[in-house]
């Protein structure tokens, strides 16, 4: 960012960090991919509101948390990326007379932190969030789940922000919620970018959620979290850059089983490989390009389709231009 942009930004009361031509590999868990034309790390929600209000009409915008389900293609992203992880990290707990309660968490809070906060406050049902490698915002956007739990099972209400910086409170009835899918009912458009449906007038992003949880035994919850994390460590390639599960599980089956049955475990292209530990993971073994990862995704989809007649659907958001 040059001095004139910095001066203009401060003149509008903005307090965050604006960067140009930012390598998105620094901000996604795959540690691969192209650059974004512009990124902004707001100081807080108020700062994000001001920044959105100042953007030109039609400017493509993406919100990114920990980047755990995201890949920016090597040709880069001609858009503005707003980072939520350091700005939207507030958490509050309110208890009810029956021992249950609610957790309010902003979109940039890591999902495992919410699981720990719930356990510390004797609230049950959020333990599975410890196994989701991303933020609450990302979990809301795709109804992330694991180990028998799904994010929207817990949601009492959410707060969203749109392109004009307008904040709204919405409840689950405003959305069609399914397996790894959340679509706002009123316009039948995705509430998040990345599904191929983009409309500047209707686009909204989650900035917080209120989760309603029953009373539980904190010690049991902590033991459950520990067991889930041990299970995750044993089954998943956590020591190398990855984006978690790459494909949704088809009805009645598992993507990992199908990919492994096609003999693709360990298959490598460039610096990326289908994990030898878990076939629904693609890992960066060193110097992977986004094109390597996408090629492996296409290979797995083609192989499973040809052998089983099943079309694997991606859980990963692919954005940007091919080089």
Region locations from a protein language model:
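A detector of low-complexity, intrinsically disordered, Ser/Thr/Gly/Pro/Ala-rich segments
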Residues: 1, 5-7, 195, 200
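Anion-binding (especially nucleotide phosphate/pyrophosphate-binding) glycine-rich loop
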Residues: 2-136, 146
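Phosphate/pyrophosphate- and phosphate-bearing ligand-binding catalytic cores of soluble enzymes
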Residues: 18-20, 26-28, 32, 70, ...
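Glycine-centered flexibility sites
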Residues: 33-34, 65-67, 76-79, 108, ...
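Hydrophobic, well-ordered secondary-structure segments
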Residues: 111, 115, 129, 133, ...
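Short, well-ordered alpha-helical segments in soluble proteins
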Residues: 118, 136, 140-144, 159-162, ...
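Basic, gly/Ser/Thr/Pro-rich low-complexity segments located predominantly at protein N termini
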Residues: 38-39, 70-72, 113, 136-143, ...
């Amino acid at each position: 960012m040059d001095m004139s942009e910095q001066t203009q930004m401060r003149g509008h009361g903005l307090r965050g960090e604006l960067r140009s031509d930012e390598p998105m590999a620094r901000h996604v868990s795959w540690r691969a991919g192209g650059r974004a034309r512009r990124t902004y790390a707001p100081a807080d929600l108020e700062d994000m509101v001001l920044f959105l209000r100042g953007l030109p009409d039609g400017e493509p915008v993406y919100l990114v948390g920990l980047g755990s389900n995201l890949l920016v293609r090597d040709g880069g992203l001609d858009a503005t990326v707003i980072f939520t992880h350091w700005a939207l990290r507030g958490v509050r707990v309110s208890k009810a007379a029956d021992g249950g309660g609610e957790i309010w968490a902003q979109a940039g809070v890591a999902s495992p932190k919410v699981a720990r906060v719930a356990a510390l406050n004797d609230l049950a049902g959020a333990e599975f969030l410890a196994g989701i490698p991303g933020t609450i915002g990302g979990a809301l956007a795709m109804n992330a789940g694991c180990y028998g739990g799904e994010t929207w099972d817990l949601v009492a209400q959410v707060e969203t922000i749109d392109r004009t910086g307008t904040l709204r409170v919405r409840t689950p009835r405003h959305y069609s919620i399914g397996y790894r899918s959340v679509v706002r009912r009123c316009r039948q458009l995705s509430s998040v970018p990345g599904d191929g449906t983009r409309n500047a007038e209707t686009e909204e992003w989650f900035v917080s959620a209120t989760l309603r949880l029953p009373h539980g035994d904190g010690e049991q919850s902590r033991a459950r979290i520990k067991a889930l994390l041990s299970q995750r460590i044993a089954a998943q390639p956590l020591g190398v850059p990855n984006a978690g599960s790459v494909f949704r599980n088809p009805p009645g089956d598992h993507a990992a089983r199908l990919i492994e049955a096609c003999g693709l475990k360990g298959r490598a292209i460039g610096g990326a490989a289908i994990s030898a530990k878990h076939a629904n993971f693609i890992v960066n073994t060193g110097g992977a390009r986004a094109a390597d990862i996408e090629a492996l995704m296409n290979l797995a989809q083609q192989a499973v389709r040809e052998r089983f007649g099943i079309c694997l659907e991606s859980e990963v958001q692919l954005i940007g231009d091919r080089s």
